[in-house]
């Protein structure tokens, strides 16, 4: 039996992510990102002991500009700093979500070592299969995973 074709989704969302080893510098880095480009702040908070995670969304150029500003500000304190272009819209929405699903037929969960790999894995899953992302929870209260 042939698989049902997956619904086409818009793919043009960009996400910028920086993780640092220095919490106060994290806030300074977020300030630089928001001043450098027209991006939306999704998250800016300590993620686990001694680390800080910031995530922004926006157009490709704006997110790349914000990430460049973040890298300049964070310098060697950055664990990872990356602009991820052309994500499925569902991934960006799941990053912002506070889930309260009505009814689930089934449930899947992926655990990753880094926040960046969680976003990349979610994008691959939603582009390759017929799933609905509910949320992406990253690096808070779960040992940085």
Residue ranges and their predicted role:
Residues 2-22, 42-51, 79-114, 119, ...:
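A structural signal for small-residue-enriched, beta-sheet-centric alpha/beta enzyme cores
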Residues 37-38, 70-79, 129-130:
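A common structural junction motif
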Residues 57-63:
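Helix N-cap motif at beta-to-alpha junctions
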Residues 66-67:
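Acidic-enriched and Gly/Ser
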């Amino acid at each position: 039996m042939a698989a049902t074709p997956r619904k086409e989704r818009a793919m043009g969302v960009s996400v910028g992510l920086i993780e640092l080893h220095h919490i106060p510098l994290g806030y300074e880095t977020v300030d630089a990102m928001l001043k450098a480009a027209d991006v939306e702040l999704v998250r800016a908070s300590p993620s686990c002991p001694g680390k800080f995670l910031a995530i922004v969304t926006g157009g490709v150029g704006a997110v790349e500009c914000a990430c460049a500003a973040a890298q300049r500000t964070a310098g060697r304190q950055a664990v990872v700093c990356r602009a991820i272009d052309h994500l499925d819209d569902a991934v960006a929405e799941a990053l912002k979500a506070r889930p309260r699903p009505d009814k689930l037929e089934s449930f899947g969960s992926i655990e990753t070592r880094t926040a960046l790999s969680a976003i990349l894995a979610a994008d691959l899953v939603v582009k390759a299969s017929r799933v609905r992302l509910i949320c992406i929870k990253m690096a808070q209260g779960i040992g940085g995973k």
